[in-house]
């Protein structure tokens, strides 16, 4: 150990942050030397090392190690010098000897120094270990050495070491080193020790250390053996190490761990209460996150007053303060470490060198000269400048902050919901403009992608470049939608403007917009959260890059969707961008895990280059050579970089393009209606190589059904059943209605899917909207700790909500037993599976178990270890909740706003609470994981052969209604059977839920929302009924009356009554049915009441009435008791019958023939509204006198002639255990459907009694083979009857049956009871009017008998009601007002009669007199049956109900006035009850006008009367006068005035107004109300016996006997007693029910189609479509305006370029003149340069005159000569002319006026002859022009919707032309023919269009044209520059033109391969075409092409003149394409 006296006080000891490194000075003989702590551990050993080396010689060991360190340090300094040299050369190489060792030293490597000798450097373990560690870099690199950067000697830097172009290389190197060291040291802190593998085998650790997590939850870090395996698997093994090296490495690891700051536990807000929650959040942020500050001023080499960190010297004045803060932080950490017994920290650290300069040559380093301190900037920023400030959260963090802490900050401190997708946007950092349409599409797509998927958008956060376009997308969203979108900005702290304003803890910073000029930038105001990343520098990029990468990689690897096992996907979106963007894309596509990238083509720069490279890269991953050259030049031009940098960028582009599966190019308009959002999501699906199930899961998590429909299910995969079931479960839980519909379209079997466990799980999920289910469950069952919803409890809730004695199937004993068995099996399977999945915790809502990560312990950056050690905030655990929610949950508040959160708050280990909501527990495991296993087990055991639920859609609809999922409930209503019943039940449930919500005083909108949902289902039920009625009325009547076994055995008609759906029951279909039921077997059209009364009075009159036929009576609903009796009687009668089979066969054959004819007749008829013989008018209601129909003998034989076959078949069916049915109700036997009713009634014999009819109608046709043929016809009562049935319909019933049908009709029962009641009232009135004798008379006994019988009937109704509990029976009975009146009347009469008999007669008489009021009111009950009186009775009842509120107010007013009046007027009274009467008596009568004028003011009246009598003055209050004046006598008259104003005028007027309103409202609905009440009347008198009181007890006695017999005969286990079911139903078998369901489903489809058509043709939809089309037209006009503006700019630019070209041409002409004058050119040549107005001038010696250019508008004489010259050379093939039909928006326009010249700005002379201009000699190369203009203006459009910078690149396909979605870029091959070899074909950058311009020389030149040669000039070196054309083409070539071009290419190719001399001669004879000829055909010529072609005639003219002058002239030289401008000029000069 080094002592303090060994160090000098002047020595500088520097200590940087512990996490990075510690540098100390070690004395060595004459001085000190600086070493790293990794190599100085032997000098400063830890206590462990000290104990191991006590016996050794310390001094000797120290000296030996110092010698070794000296040699190593010497070599390191040498290498450092080389590294610094490389760094100065801008080569990014890591320094050796620092924390990150990038150099690899192999033990056997041959490393020699400069002299060739072996250095003394020995292999060291620590550097080797670190080098291996950093080879396994998992992020920030493109692995595999795709583009290695060469380092020093044997070192090479991979992609992760290469900094982005805008990041300082040293900063990048240091930041990577710091982050890597921090990850490594965290592993050591967590107890992970490296045991390196030796040559002989693995080194086994002596002990196994386990470190527990700080969260206290028992999660432990893997043991060292596990860490060892992970270390070996990660590729960090080190071989060839000695034991001493291992020891040093272990000691070094221990020393490093001693200096490590232990990570702060993840924030868990459940640990804190509400009072200190905010404070603890702030403390946690301050303790967890750090900032980085510069600790020493080291002057920069460029500016001595500025530090290497970028700040000035004055900004470093706070270094002493930072030092103190740093020391305080270290001491606190040391104390913490000492408490944890990790190691001791040396606090005696000299920090004076933190702000002093060590040496003159020292360079500033981020690792050495920065320290990490606690963050001092976090809070809220308010962006000003808008209508209201936008608020955002921000925090300043260090660049090496762990992503786990950041995620904890997001989810728990800032309360951000976990992401389901990460969209990271990259692009240009400087401002740029997008094309208008592309900008609109990008904004719309990004907003849709973020809002629909729950994504997080991550940007740089700076208010420049691509971030502005992201902000524009968010601006288009609504405020509510924008608040849900999470946009996170990761911005560099050092580049932030006014960053000093952000410094403060929990500070609110007002932020005002500022200019974006300068190096620093501001924050964008559309972001919600900001991470201000700090690396200690100012004005530099790079800090945010590292943190952003680490955060994105952490999310993609460790963050899970919905807490399951699927990681959150990350996608990159590229918009424009520079070289840094290309580097980022390269990292994304080459890192692990891969990140898909979406590139927006047409946005500019990097995006366009990436899109072009992706499209044109070949299969071998390279670009074609010709395209590569053009792209290389375009890269140089676009980015303004050097050639080497351009090559590097091009290589990176190529590498990116090789990953085609990861790159998705979005091209506007290419994919139809698909926008950017579709491209983003499809890129994720195709870029991650996911299975179909995983793709479906992602689409489901994003809630993008369009992606699933177009990209997942469109591939034709064979989907396993389990995958579809899991997806359906997820869709149901998360309320994904569209996905449910999509999965149903894929053919999922819902009966197999929906099991008891899954339904139980659905009720217990905590996802979905808030609902009131828990509150209602708490009312019906006792809720305890850890309660979970159970299906039997849900059944109780349904029964409570439905009311009216509704019985749910969940509460039956059969279902309860089944539920218990299933739950036991689930628990058993779960326990059994725990042995296999013990390491997998339970899931909470994702449907997939969460598995613990088995990856290596990579530190906090890895994520899994942090979740296991420091808390459960990540992975599969639910996030903690806000304390407000917990408090509301504990207090039992019934507020609904946080109901779901309330239930979720109790899912963890929280204190017990008696009001605790349900806990999910392991429900997901039970439901979705073990269902298949349970089904297999059940199938193997044979215990389950049918699905758990017959109608799964009905069960799911109830679940959706109870959990308030309206869209899901609507979806389930549209699917499945019994749609009408489902709509009615949903309406009732919603109404009851709304009532419960109103009673609980929940939010008003919740109640109103539930009422709205109920109204929607009510309307749907009515629409469905109306549609079915118009399709087929007969089947609709059956739908209303058949028994619904799944809905408490009710009917749709009964459900409508329960729902109180007045409009439903008022429908004509229901009224027809009720009218038929009311009349029973009677057929009466007019005066039915009079006829029935006459029949009751005179029974013989019954025979004169009209009745229904026998067949019509068979098709009527019946009660359950009648149905049971019919089956029993039919069984007994059929068993005693016998007949021959021959007659049966004959009868059956005849029936079959008739049926076949009937079916053939009806087969082709369309479905219309049919009116069959079994319509509603033929239905009948039977009474409760069951025995009256069942008096036939049981042993009566069947008629042999008619019913032999029926009896025989019935006997066989009874023997097989079958059942029978009657009246349209058939039993089910072996799945064979019985025949229709009319066949059962077919008989040729006459029935002598009704037992014959009953026998025949109740026989079942089941087993006879002849009858089975009849059953195949499937004819029901709704089909058109055959002729036999029509013949049978005329048969009438017998006399005895007439009496029975008359007395059993409800109308007859009603009149019998009414007449009886009238007689009772008459006798009762008589007894009250006469004197009451002491003894009761006969009339009184009759009356008491009547009342007693009436009371017994009421008791029977109560007992036989459907409700099971007795109190429920009483409650149901009392709900009726008339029942209450009846009970009170009966009780008072019995009390009064007994008082009259056994007590005081007078008092008894009084009681009876009062009771007469109630009996008289009972008359209104009978009157309500009348269609006119009934509505008025309803109105009166409603008025009385509403009048009660006014009466209460009136009583208060009476009391206030009456009490004051009584007390003042009569002050001396003693107490008596009459005083209370006086308070109300007279004031009440004052309301009706009786004001008691004499008693108003008695004192004043007497004084006035005395005044009138005596004539004296008016004296008041004088005692001598004897006046009765009391104190305050004047007050009562004053009070009475106000009383009459309020009571008599105000309240009475209000009461009258209310009555008027009630009358008006009721009058409108009076008919509906009466029709609704009519059902109750029909059902009441149907269940009432015909015998009225006092004869009713006779019926009761018979009923008791039947009940006893039924109980004795029925089994004890039978729950349903048919005697208590009086509802009228049709009992159908399964086949008939299936037919009804088919009919209902067909009507549902027709109704849905009709509603869809109505919606599409509605005015709203038309207006919407018109609005959309108007927007499209407006956007198109905007695009056209933009194109027009762009065209103007291009034209202006072309004009300016032409002016510059003309200027250059004049200069060239001057040069040519000078050259010719120097060479003593002939006089003719000299005359050439003097422009002459005469174009045809010859010299005296015959030499040609000036060479002229023939342009449009020149002299017609020349045109004729040119024409003649062209005719002479017709034999030669014409030149290739390419005519592109293009629409240009830029320059190149040529006027057609004759006096307009193309290139000369000078006007023509006075004579009108245009002036001639000489041609230029040199090529008009566009390179001298500004490159910026060329890159922006020279664009040829390949796409109709947008332009790209790559449009100027010419694409050449040698073999075939590839036509893609863009506009065709034609290739033009120009020939460069050499005099000595063949021609070679080159690719022109422009579209192939040969513009051959012909010169117009003088006459001498024309004569010698045959000797002239034409030279073609091409410049491949400047190919890319020429490619940047200045016209934008918007048309494409046609197919015909394309074929012509191909032919021309073939001809040109053949010409190019001709012999050179032959070709040369052919070229001499080749005619030249004039420019006028080309332009005359309407072709638009590019001015650059014109200028280039002008070079040819000048060269030709010069050569001719040379030849004529006798100069030696060799073979014509043809300018090669590779010739540059200098070469061409020199060649021309030499020729001259």
Swiss-Prot record:
Compositionally skewed regions (Basic residues) per UniProt: 129-139, 1951-1962
GO cellular component, one term: plasma membrane
GO biological-process terms attached to the record: defecation; gonad development; metal ion transport; mitotic cell cycle; monoatomic cation transmembrane transport; monoatomic cation transport
Tissue specificity note: Gonads.
Compositional bias of kind Low complexity: 1130-1149
Protein topology in the membrane: Multi-pass membrane protein
Functional summary from the UniProt entry: Required for initiation and continuation of postembryonic mitotic cell divisions of gonadal cells Z1 and Z4. Zygotic expression is necessary for hermaphrodite fertility. May be a cation channel.
Protein family (similarity comment): Belongs to the transient receptor (TC 1.A.4) family. LTrpC subfamily.
Protein name, per record: Transient receptor potential channel
Organism: Caenorhabditis elegans
